Amino acid sequence: MLFNSYIFIFVFLPLTLGSYYGLHKLGKPVFAKITLILMSFWFYGYFNPNYLWIMCSSIIVNYLLSQLLQRKWEMSAAQIAVLKKSLLAIGLIFNLGLIFYFKYYDFFVDNLNKVFSTDFQLKNIVLPLGISFFTFQQVSYMVDSYRGETKEYNFADYALFVTFFPQLIAGPIVLHNEVLPQFEDKNNWKINWDNMAHGLYMFAAGLVKKAVIADTLSVSVAWGYGHLSQNLTSMEAILTMLAYTFQIYFDFSGYCDMATGLGYMFNIQIPMNFNSPYKALSIIDFWKRWHLTLTRFLRTYVYFPLGGSRRGTVRTYINIITVFLVSGLWHGANWTFIFWGFLHGIGNALTRMFKKQWESMHEVMQWAVTFLFVNVTWIFFRADSISQAFAFIKRILGFKNLNVRAPFLQTFQLKEFHLIYSHIPVLNKIMASIRGVDALVLLAGLFFLCLNFKNNQEMKFRPTAKLAVLTVFCLVWGIFTLSGVSEFLYFNF
């Protein structure tokens, strides 16, 4: 089920909130918890119930292994160490095997066939929604159990930790000690109207980012990549690149706002996952702002176990690049994602290597270079193949044709704005007289929003009449734009 859908907004969310708080009010906290788990199952299996057995099996196996890791065994210390390492290895093999089969099997076999001229059959496996997210979340719990850093939670608590629907399909990747204590806090079992208002505002803001901005830009991006082989001009390629840069920004930012807002409605504060990444002054800074919980997971469970920065300069750079290769592979089974991760690893390593020179540059130059790097690397993230990405970059660098065709410019129109100014003669005349003004105004406005406003999660929330009006306006605007419902980009990872 999608946050940006009528059934979620008008059916699922009211039912879930009403049943959860209603059961708590009746003094049935266990039933409230179980109901929230079952509603999360409905949310997950809405489009394809076949996904449910995968997630349920994963939850059961990981919970049992974690229980065994937490158990006080009556053995010698050496025997316990061997047993726990064996259990952890089984758990990691199970989880990585699950991801490999559903996400990477066809990719692996396809490349095997190409390299060795074999003819192994592809299975055309449908990727279960959010498998990378709920698997990584459970891996973190299992590793923490191995380290003795977890409490003994019952199965319902564990299932709720994994399935809580605001973060189930596209993150953030939460830790057990971030959410489970909040569910156990009795003060969170009754409606907090300040949190409800805060959550509704965040949800409404995220809905506009997704349904109005990101989905509009998705049409422009699809047009640009679709016309790459049909004499796409250099200026059209540049505008397409910028359109995707802002599409993925507002798509992911919108999702994070909506997920955070939904958490607030249940009195649960989920960790920040997005913090104005296009304000970054370096690639290192970018990854302190983009997908924060994935960065935290890779740092804690991949980078540090590899040795981090403790084994010399060369090993540090190798570890950094390895982590970003894992990040790229995590995002998708395609060489484009791996190469995207590799480029970010190189960028991160070079920034560290030339730290003094970088910091001696003016901040404006630091921002410009970082933003340009992020833009160019997003091309690999979006392209269907590395060859297509290089063809796209070649088209940008050609500067042979700076014309922009009218059908492409029309894709940048926000329908609501067009409807307004078309009924105001003066504005309509101005807009009609300046070719491409829709694209110019939209992209300039998005630059302004990204660079001059705080992230919604950073702002101190104060419920006021003005904010209530803004919330209602955003909610209505977003809902009326839901005629063409589309998935969030990160649902595919």
Predicted regions and their residues:
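Membrane-embedded transmembrane alpha-helical bundles that form the catalytic cores
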Residues: 1-448, 456-492
